[in-house]
């Protein structure tokens, strides 16, 4: 199993990141911590950066009239943060990511929500 540190000298250790191929076990779920709380600034910058200026993401009055009642965090921002959370654990040692088979967002994300991620090993190739 993956160790968090490696010895680099007498009484000297260095933090390590990532997993090697043999460290992945089909069916295992890896939790990614720490969490990340989404701010209004995060959401505003991301909507502007990606040119996704739908008012549901930043217009409070518009959002009040929707089923959500308040602005939604832009979904690609949610994905980007969760992917970033996983890097040090599951892909730090990878040469290339093979891709994602399934991404689910079962609930809306709002400003002030804290995200936690997890990855499940479905197969190895």
Q: Which sequence ranges carry the predicted segments?
A:
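Hydrophobic beta-sheet segments that form the core/acyl-binding groove
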Residues: 100-125
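Hot-dog-fold acyl-thioester-processing enzymes
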Residues: 2-99
């Amino acid at each position: 199993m993956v160790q968090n540190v490696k010895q680099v000298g007498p009484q000297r250790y260095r933090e390590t990141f990532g997993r090697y191929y043999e460290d992945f076990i089909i069916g295992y779920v890896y939790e990614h911590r720490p969490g990340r709380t989404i701010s209004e600034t995060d959401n505003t910058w991301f909507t502007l950066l990606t040119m996704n200026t739908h008012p549901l993401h930043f217009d409070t009055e518009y959002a009040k009239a929707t089923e959500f009642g308040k602005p939604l965090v832009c979904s690609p921002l949610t994905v980007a943060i969760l992917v970033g959370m996983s890097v040090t654990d599951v892909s730090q040692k990878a040469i290339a990511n093979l891709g994602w088979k399934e991404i689910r967002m079962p609930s809306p994300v709002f400003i002030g929500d804290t995200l936690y991620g997890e990855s499940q090993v479905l197969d190895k190739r």
